[in-house]
Structures are given as structure tokens and as C-alpha cells.
Amino acid sequence: MRSIIALVLAVLVLVGTVLSIVRARAWWIRIWDFPRVQLAVLAAAALALGWDRWLRGWPWTALGVLLVAALAFQLMLVWRYTPLAPREVQRSRAADDGRRISIMISNVLQTNRQADRLLAVARAADPDIVLCVETDDWWRARLDALATTHPHAVRCALPNTYGMLLYSRLPLEDVREERLVEPDIPSVQARVRLRGGARVWLNCVHPRPPAPGESDESLPRDAELLLVGKRVRDASDPVIVCGDLNDVAWSRTTRLFQKVSRLVDPRKGRGLYSTFHARVPLFRWPLDHVFHSDSFRLVALRRLPYVGSDHFPVFVALSHEPPAAAEQEAPTETSEDLQEARETVQEGRAQGASTG
């Protein structure tokens, strides 16, 4: 019986690993980008269960070798998001509030009705900026309670699970609500004035995921992320990109986004900070992200308590310290990376225009 279970697990791991490598955008292929940790655990379980089989003839030995290779491949992709890896963003030791900015991001789940729970978490975390997605008019009416402490707001409530509400206690300038790729998917850009006077270019996104009932392929999501990455790469102001990206940190698209945008990820060397699925611990991965310029250092990063949604909120506090740019290494792009990003954006916009 152990051998049968080991064989079934091995086949599942190998199929999932191979499909995740395939350069195709179909949702049923791209979905295998997500469960890297789960596939690694299943690979280890299969190796342990079949320990007395792997040297009994070449078919079993070959399967064992492939399983070890799959385990190594999965671990290679996720190890950067463990405390074993070097930190991409240094810890800030500055105590200057004038340089700091804190953000709470929450996918509220549009059908969730525990608004009081979310408001309590937001008040306890006390961020400078609250970004909520999947917000409709019902959520707008409840979350407007934040306006008493966060009077600078951008409201784009929608009934299609892609609404976006932004509340800030810091002044917002040059605010834009755009539909970057698809006509029904908004994003928000604004310049945030820090207490010390510096301006930060904030980009809030929530692209459509590749999933049944959403999109048959990952092109709309990939194009939006890479378009934002291209926009911010040469920005004169420091940049923060945040939101529910509907992608994991280790996917090819997110890694390409990081290289094209030249932004850093504070989770590297610290942990996964998995936010989805809040109610299913065995199937949980990081979908809610914050990327920023290398001129920021990290003050705090934590996952916040459950708010009734299928996502946990996440909180990040950053300190703008320009000398950090010389000490923190942002990812760099190649000409091939830029070409791939350019082609993806062009394809995504063409598809969005044809369907809009």
C-alpha cells in the first residue's frame, strides 16, 4: 500500500512540476506555479514512503531520481522566501517618522459581511494607507468610516469583484484611476507626500487571475503587471507597487516584473507571508504583495489577523533612506527580458481592446 501511495504522489509531483515549466498561458498550466511548497512536501512524502523501492530495479530508481530532481527544483524556487536566504531589503534603524510610510492591503472578499472585523484590524494596525480590493458599494459605505482618520481617498467601487478603495492619512497628489489592460479592471496611481516632504509614487493593482470563471489564460494579468513594471522602472520618485497580484512571488511573471521594474521584495530572506487561502491552511500561498524601490528600508512586515475574507490582510512599514540604494541590490533586466515584457504588454492590450 505504501508503494502505491508513493507512486501516486510521485506521478502528481512530476506532472505538476513539468506543467509548471511549460511556457504556456492556459490557466490549467499556470495554476501549477502556485503550489510549490505543497509539491515539495508531497515529493518528500513520496520519497519517504517509497524509501525501500527506489533501488529495486531501474524503473523505480529512475522515478526516484526524477522525484529528487523535482524536489530540488521546487525548493530552489521558494528558498529565497525563507529565513535561510539573504535578505533583499535591510532592516531600518532610523527613527524618523518623516521618512516612514505604512500600508495595509486587504482583499476583503466582496461577499464577506464582516466589515466591523476589518475596520477593527485596520484601526489596530494603524497604517498610513489602507488599500482594499474586491470592494463594491456595500463595502464603500462601511469603509468610509476610515475617512475620519484617513481623509484622502480614492473610491472605485465596482460590483464585479475588482473594485478598489484607497484611504490615506498622508496627502495624495496626481491621483489617477486607470484601466491599464482590461476595461473593467481598475488600478490606482498616486503620489503620496510623506511627513518629511518626500513624494512616493504609489501604484495599486489587482489584475484578473488565470482561473475558471475569470480568464482562460494568464495574459491579462501578466500584461498588467509588466506594464506597471515598465512604467515605474525609470521613475524620478521612489516607487511602491502593491495589491493582490493574483500571482505568487516565485512565478516567472513576478520574477520578470521585478527585473523590469527594478523593485525589491522585503519578503526575501524573511518568509512566505502567505495570504490566500485564509480558511484552507494546506493550500495557502502569497498573493498579496508589496514591492518597492531600493531606496527604502524595512520597518515592519506582518500578516494581519483573519477578517472574514479568503485573504489575510498584510501590513508593511517602510522608511525612505536614499543611501540604502547603494547597499541593496535590486534585480536587473536583460534585453531579452525587456523584449518579452514589451511583447506581453502589446498582446495583452490588443486582447483587452478587442474584448472591451
Language-model segments: residues:
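Membrane-embedded alpha-helical segments of integral membrane proteins
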Residues: I4-R53, L63-L75
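Glycine/proline-rich, flexible active-site/cofactor-binding loop segments
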Residues: L49-R80, I185-H206
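Intrinsically disordered, low-complexity boundary segments flanking structured domains
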Residues: V18-L19, V89-R93, R140-A141, R252-T253
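N-terminal signal-anchor transmembrane helix
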Residues: W58-A124
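Soluble catalytic domains of enzymes that build or remodel membrane lipids, polysaccharides, and related
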Residues: I103, L109-A124, I129-G356
